Amino acid sequence: MMMRKPDITTIRDKGKPNHACGGNNNKPKLRKGLWSPDEDEKLIRYMLTNGQGCWSDIARNAGLLRCGKSCRLRWINYLRPDLKRGSFSPQEEDLIFHLHSILGNRWSQIATRLPGRTDNEIKNFWNSTLKKRLKNNSNNNTSSGSSPNNSNSNSLDPRDQHVDMGGNSTSLMDDYHHDENMMTVGNTMRMDSSSPFNVGPMVNSVGLNQLYDPLMISVPDNGYHQMGNTVNVFSVNGLGDYGNTILDPISKRVSVEGDDWFIPPSENTNVIACSTSNNLNLQALDPCFNSKNLCHSESFKVGNVLGIENGSWEIENPKIGDWDLDGLIDNNSSFPFLDFQVD
């Protein structure tokens, strides 16, 4: 006896209701898509009368063939009376930046903190405007942070300039031009052995920072000790008129011609002045040198007398003074013409 296979169509349609046999077909079909003005008026009238509640009940009670979600979105995004229109204010933009840095892309939570704005509106405004502005600002900050390094790279080469302690920048090439004539004097300076002089008031106006005592003059430690166009620098008592440009017979001050003044270190020998000019005839005051010329017009080597070697003027602490008078007089007995007045 053969078994018949069951009909596949019968099994497939077994669980479905038979509409022809009086099945439940009374459920209305909901609408989708755009809202009509009539639907908007029904929803507004019901919401202003009854307020918010369950959106599925609102759709049914308002006589709308819409689902609850569609009614909620239509009311919140378009129909509520407190809805703001137009562009965002600068205060709202700052608040969106702040809330987005905390909440991220949680637009519904951000919208609850901006009255009158919807989450969809805030999201669209962020993606279209604020996100690009934030990216541009970050790029500008990155470029501005790298610009100081570029400006520092354009600064002058330290081999071409040096800066003294006073903040003045001078060129090394100018110093090299004065290398050979650094110790020259405008005219010959001669000292009369019969004229006494005082060491104390030797320097009255040198343009230095401080003058502690008559026997010591401290010069700022800036490598090259330059004092510019200085006239009537040294005041020497008892010296007569020894030249038109060396000694002033009225004020008894030593004035030299030239642009730059340099003071070498002189701790063992009394040296009056040095300047840049054409002729050089520098004489020491110590009689043990017998008024010997220390330099000539082209090159010189002063050695221990001035603390200079091969025309180099890079000195640490140049001074005029700090003599031990007792030891100096004991070692040099031939000082009858020098009258040192010490207070």
From Swiss-Prot:
InterPro entries: Homeodomain-like_sf (IPR009057), Myb_dom (IPR017930), Plant_SW-associated_TFs (IPR051953), SANT/Myb (IPR001005). Residues 136-155 have a biased composition (Low complexity). Residues 55-79, 107-130 bind DNA. PROSITE patterns: HTH_MYB (PS51294). One of its GO terms (biological process) is regulation of secondary cell wall biogenesis. Disruption phenotype: No visible phenotype under normal growth conditions, but the double mutant plants myb48 and myb83 nearly lack secondary wall thickening, stop growing after developing one to two pairs of small leaves and subsequently die. Residues 1-33, 134-172 are annotated as: Disordered. Keywords: Activator, DNA-binding, Nucleus, Repeat, Transcription, Transcription regulation. One of its GO terms (molecular function) is transcription cis-regulatory region binding. Residues 27-79, 80-134 form the HTH myb-type domain. PANTHER family: MYB DOMAIN PROTEIN 55, TRANSCRIPTION FACTOR MYB83. This is Transcription factor MYB83. The gene is MYB83.
